[in-house]
Amino acid sequence: VYKNWYDQEIPTHMVKHIDKKIVLWQAMISQKQQRELDSLFKTEEDLHILIMNVEALSTQKGVDFAKKFLFSHRALMAVDESTTIKNPDAKRTKSICDLGLASRYNRILTGSPVTKSPLDLYKQCEFLQPELLGFSSYYAFRARFAKLKTMNYGGKSFQLVTGYKNLDELAEIIKPFSERILKKECLDLPPKTYIKRTIQLSTEQQKLYTQMKRMAIAELHGKTMTTATALVQLMRLQQITCGHFKADDGSVKQIKNNRISELLSVLDEVEGKAIIWCHWRHDIQNVVAAITKEYGPRSVVTYYG
C-alpha cells in the first residue's frame, strides 16, 4: 500500500506547481537511500514527503527516524489503512499514536474503520487526538459501548465481549470529525479495484535471491540449491521470494519472510470469507498454520491437488 503512494497516488493527485521531494523508506538502507533520507533535513522551499510502511514503525530504527522527521517539520501525519492501528495492545499502535503527538496535523484513511468491532475505533481516533471520543482509556470506552461478561479460565477471570450497545451515540460522536465518501461519489472507477501489495524481501531472502540470480547456486544452513537451465533458475527464484528453499536433496527449508504477516494484515481488514491462492504446496501449509494460530482450527480449509 505505502509504495503505491510513491509510484502512483502522489504523482497523480498532487498539483504540479508545488515543488516537492518524496522519499520512500526502505528496510535495507543503501548509501544512496541514506543520502535521500538525509536530504529531507535540508533547509529549502520544497515540500518534504516521507513515505513509510507501518511495519517500519514496529522497529526502533523506523520510529527514531519518523520522530526526527516530525520534530524537524511542521508536519501532517497520515495513516493509510488505519485499521492497522486498531489493536490497543500492539507495539506498532502505541508507537504510531506516540508519533502522532509530535505532528501538527493528523489524518487517517481507510475503506472501513470498523472491520470486526466498533471498539476498533478507539485507537484510530486517539491517533487523531487524545480523548477525541471523550474517554481517557480504552477500557472506559469499551465499558460504554460493549456488552461484557465476566468469564473464568485457568483460575483467572477476564471480560468477554458478547455484543455492543449505544452505537447510535457512538455514531453521533464520530460524525463531526469524519467524512465518508462512496466510490461512486468521487471517482469514475471500475466495478472492482485491484490493489497490489509490495512486500520487501527479508535480509536472508535478498542474500539467497542474489546468489541464485548471479551464480545459479544458493546455500542455506549447509544445504545447496543449484539449477541447470534458465527456466529452473526462474522457478527457484520464485520459491525464494515465496519464503522457502528447496535443496537439491529434496529437503525444504523455511526462509524468514514478510508474506505471512502481510497476509494476516489483509485478512484483518476484510469482512467475511476470503479466497487465498498459493503457488506452492509449502505456501499452503504455511498459510494454514498462520491462520489456524490466529483464528482457530476451524477458520480455514484447503483445496488443492
Question: Which positions does each model-derived feature cover?
Answer:
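A short helix-turn-beta junction within AAA+ P-loop NTPase domains corresponding to the substrate/partner-engaging
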Residues: Y105-N106, L121-S137
